[in-house]
Every structure is written in structure tokens, then in C-alpha cells.
Regions:
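Loop-helix junctions at membrane interfaces
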Residues: 1-190
Length: 190
């Protein structure tokens, strides 16, 4: 019988630190955006690229919490209220982009063209689920928003987030993979 006290419980320290750093980065760049003038409350932002990078490196739990925390804090600080349907959509996006993290090999320095293709197919799928399904449906259910408005916002967010992640997220993934040494200073002390 194994000793249960020797088994690790909870999230690894690296994942917890990554969530904190990822959420802080997203909040720090939250206001860096280009308004999409013809669609209300929709902007071209870099948030999705950071959430995708954290999820792609550390997995779906890191993606989930980076998306949830960063959107919640960003809305509270910069907009005075939290739009929960979009917070949840960012969390779902974070989970989905994190599902292929083992295949991407970013942390091992093995992110190449094949992994970039997998990353981008997955992020387009994740963006579609988050912004064409989750956000608009929750906008209708939670806030009784008009369906034509929220689906136009969703399509715009899908296109903007997909494009930003395609360019910025892919560049960040390549860059992180190239500088990754395989060792980390984030080790548990004895």
C-alpha cells in the first residue's frame, strides 16, 4: 500500500506561477486595443494570444484560470463591472487551447511548423467555441441581450482573436520554444 502523504496534491508550482504571470500580463495589456468601431464593446486585443500561450505551454487548467482571472480583473479595473458571459468564454477558450499542450512541445524547445499548425487549428476551434457559441448564448441567457447584436459581437471577437493569436501567439510560441533551456528555477525547495 502506498503512502498517500508522499503523493503530490494540487497544481504544480510552475503552473500556479504561470497562471499568475499570465493573468498579470493580460491585465497589463488589457487596454492595449484597437476598437472595432462598427461593433459595440468589441476590440482587437492581444489577450487571446497570451491566454493561448499559457494554455499551450502549461495545459488546460492554466489556460482556464489565466482566462478567468485576467478577464475578471481586467473588467473590474478598466470597465467598472464584470461581464460574466465573456469571462466564462475566456475560461473555456483557455481550457480548449490547453488541450494540445503535450503535442506542441513548446517547453521542450520542439515547437516547429507541424506544432504551429496544430496550435492554430486548435486556437481557431477554441475561438469558435468561445465566441460563436459560449459568449453569445450566455449573453442572451444572463443579460437578455438581443441575439443579433451578440452574435455579431461573437463573430467579430472570433475573427479578431483568431487573427491576433495566429500572428502574435504563434510568434510567442516559437520564441518561447527557442529560448527554453529545459531547466527552470521554479523548483520546490526541500
Amino acid at each position: 500500500m502506498s503512502d498517500l502523504s508522499t503523493k503530490k496534491k494540487g497544481l504544480p508550482i510552475k503552473t500556479i506561477v504561470a497562471i499568475g504571470i499570465g493573468a498579470a500580463l493580460v491585465v497589463a495589456i488589457y487596454q492595449v486595443s484597437i476598437p472595432v468601431g462598427f461593433i459595440p464593446n468589441t476590440r482587437l486585443q492581444f489577450n487571446a494570444a497570451i491566454i493561448a500561450l499559457i494554455g499551450a505551454i502549461f495545459g488546460p487548467i492554466a489556460g482556464l484560470f489565466t482566462g478567468l482571472l485576467s478577464h475578471t480583473i481586467g473588467d473590474a479595473l478598466f470597465y467598472g463591472g464584470i461581464w460574466w458571459s465573456w469571462v466564462i468564454a475566456d475560461g473555456v477558450y483557455g481550457i480548449l487551447v490547453g488541450l494540445t499542450f503535450k503535442k506542441l512541445r513548446i517547453s521542450e524547445g520542439g515547437f516547429g511548423s507541424k506544432q504551429a499548425l496544430i496550435f492554430n487549428i486548435n486556437q481557431v476551434f477554441a475561438n469558435a467555441v468561445a465566441w460563436l457559441l459560449v459568449a453569445p448564448v450566455l449573453d442572451i441567457l444572463i443579460y437578455a441581450e438581443p441575439s443579433d447584436k451578440v452574435f455579431v459581437q461573437g463573430v467579430t471577437a472570433f475573427a479578431a482573436n483568431g487573427a491576433v493569436t495566429l500572428v502574435v501567439g504563434t510568434i510567442l510560441a516559437f520564441a518561447y520554444s527557442k529560448i527554453r533551456t529545459g531547466n527552470s528555477s521554479l523548483e520546490k525547495e526541500a
